[in-house]
Amino acid sequence: MNSGAPKPPNGPPPMKHARIALAVLLAPIALLGAWTAARDAGGTVRIDGSSTVYPFAEAVAEEFSKKNPGTKVTVGQSGTGGGFKRFGAGETDFSNASRPIKAGEIEACKAKSVEFVELPVAFDGLTIVVNPANDWAKQITVEQLKAIFLSSTAAKRWKDVDPSWPDEPIKVYSPGTDSGTFDYFREVVVGKDGTMRADMSVSEEDNVLVRGVAGERNAIGFFGFAYYTENAKKVRAVPVVNPKTGKAVTPTHDTIEDGSYAPFGRPLFVYVSKAGLAKPSCMAFAQFMLDHAGELAEEVGYVKLPQVLYDRAKANLKALRTGTQMIGPDGKDLHGPIAETYR
């Protein structure tokens, strides 16, 4: 039946014309939006934790921010333990650590339903330092360090450690108890259940430790390799006798990488929450970090990992593989080369 209504002209109806016109107008805007999203993740990235890992995290944040100026990245340094407390409470997206996460810290995360992906990022060599005027401690053994740092045997004077050393008081500088460097040193030197001497000057700020040792002729202290290399003119690194070979080894990029600087060579980690990775900003940051970890680790004074470890970390990030690989099924910490434990 012919209603008498006029037939539409050939071509699309008026509404379709309007949609096409609108699409043409919006196309450049859509392209601009896609380009901007690819260029700048936006949002926020919250990082805290180890003061040892801080220079690396800061370098990553600086480079990432150049390419993503719309993303707000904050980097704190409250120590490995302090960082995990905030991380377990859901206050941060990334937690830097100079040691693997502990079983108790994992339980704290579980209590708040915080799942995480574990990412190794670099090697470090915990460095024993003295004042440059110290011309007697040419090398040091783990047993001598124990004599200095263990509370029950704490040597008060250098001659108490070695009779050939001067009759001068020992001034000890140490990272604070929230520091992963403190935990690592204590475990290696005095044992997990050992107590460190109580008269140490402690600080979570490695620069404070540098100034302390640099200003005291009879001082001894320890911190990460990057802070040593940054301040090598102010303090002197003491070669450590490798317990297996009996040879004194100075921390360098080569000796840390090949494992001869033992027992103080160690991997550094960044932990990222699964909830954080749901944010484009955090996923973009984590991917950028792993893409550039080797070069930035070297740039700030650490030692890059073998590429196979970065590849494994990228695969674990992509798969959102949660949990730690540094604790065995029996609940005990795993030791040995990280390439054998991290898969």
What are these regions (language model features)?
Residues W35-R343:
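Flexible loop/hinge segments at secondary-structure junctions
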Residues M1-T44:
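Short, low-complexity disordered leader/linker segments with a strong preference
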